[in-house]
């Protein structure tokens, strides 16, 4: 017996699959793994469910996967609810075309003291450190990362994103949605290359592609189990995209943009850190100068098409700093910035989660 084993529903991929049918025995281990999982689920469920139902006096279903996953969510939500925001104060000086910040202080009076001590004093540049850094292109989307991005950019729930993506899949405009891989298989390289050429010529954000795409970076068949990463299909070139519902159009544009970004060039910039001294107190200013926009230019053009409310605030550390030299002096103007501690770090995924992409973010 031979099996048709494909990771894409495109006509070319299906034809190639039928031309390269694989022996059924190659997949016996998948069956055996499924039997092991089913047995483990049954053993945990039949024993733990009976135990905890007796202990609590009501039926309480316990599972091998859902119960520990739910426990992680409950634990993290409890940490978020218990978090208390605390204000802190940062003395700042403005001089030489930049704003430099001191240390975070819990007491406003301490920040006021530093500001007063800096009044009428001269600020001098202690050091100027420059370092060339790179930001590698992002990976292609799997279902989880796409759902996260759609929620952050458009506010769509995970189910909405899946519904839109499923509809695109049924219209043959996107590849299989329920995938956990962020790579393509080797047989998809030619399709991806032709698709990228069309996106570069026909999508507004495609104009940011100035170099040859690096498809090898997103190709690794060993990291594809059942289905490869989510990308558009070549059917997009024969479809009136304006006729699609807005949600489907948003999701399709996002995965198209990610394909161009993932195969784009590395983003290179020069990070600049300036340390100043004023009245014996140290102040730091950070900025950067872009040397090669790379894939971030594609992302920038994509975000230009979003509504203003959907654009993220620019980080002051991303702005370019004026040219400064060690020993340069200025007459600064002082002030105090008041901010609150946030819970953004608490909303990161737990280090106990086994997913590789989550562990990288923690």
Predicted regions and their residues:
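Toprim catalytic domain recognition across nucleic-acid enzymes
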Residues: 1-361
């Amino acid at each position: 017996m031979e099996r048709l084993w494909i990771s894409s529903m495109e006509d070319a991929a299906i034809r190639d699959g039928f031309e390269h049918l694989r022996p059924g025995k190659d997949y016996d281990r998948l069956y055996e793994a499924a039997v092991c999982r089913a047995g483990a689920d049954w053993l945990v469920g039949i024993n733990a469910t009976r135990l905890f139902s007796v202990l609590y006096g009501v039926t309480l279903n316990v599972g091998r996967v859902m119960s520990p996953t739910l426990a992680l969510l409950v634990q993290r939500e409890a940490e978020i609810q218990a978090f208390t925001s605390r204000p802190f104060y940062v003395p700042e000086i403005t001089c030489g075309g930049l704003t430099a910040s001191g240390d975070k202080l819990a007491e406003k009076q301490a920040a006021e003291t530093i500001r007063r001590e800096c009044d009428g004093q001269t600020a001098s540049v202690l050091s100027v450190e420059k370092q060339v850094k790179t930001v590698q292109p992002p990976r292609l989307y799997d279902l989880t990362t796409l759902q996260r991005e759609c929620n952050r950019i458009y506010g769509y729930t995970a189910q909405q994103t899946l519904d839109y993506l499923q509809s695109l899949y049924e219209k043959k405009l996107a590849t299989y949605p329920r995938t956990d891989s962020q790579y393509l298989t080797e047989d998809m390289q030619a399709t991806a290359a032709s698709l990228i050429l069309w996106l570069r010529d026909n999508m507004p954000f495609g104009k940011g592609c100035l170099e040859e795409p690096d498809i090898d970076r997103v190709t690794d068949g060993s990291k594809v189990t059942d289905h490869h990463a989510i990308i558009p299909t070549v059917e997009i070139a024969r479809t009136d995209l304006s006729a699609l519902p807005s949600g489907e159009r948003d999701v399709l544009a996002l995965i198209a943009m990610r394909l161009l970004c993932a195969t784009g060039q590395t983003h290179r910039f020069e990070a600049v850190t300036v340390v100043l001294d004023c009245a014996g107190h140290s102040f730091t200013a950070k900025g950067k100068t872009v040397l090669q926009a790379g894939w971030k230019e594609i992302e920038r053009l994509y975000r230009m098409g979003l509504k203003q409310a959907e654009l993220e605030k620019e980080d002051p550390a991303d702005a370019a700093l004026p040219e400064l030299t060690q020993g340069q002096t200025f007459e600064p103007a002082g002030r105090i910035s008041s901010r609150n501690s946030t819970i953004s770090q608490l909303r990161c995924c737990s280090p106990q989660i086994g997913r590789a992409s989550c562990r990288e973010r923690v």
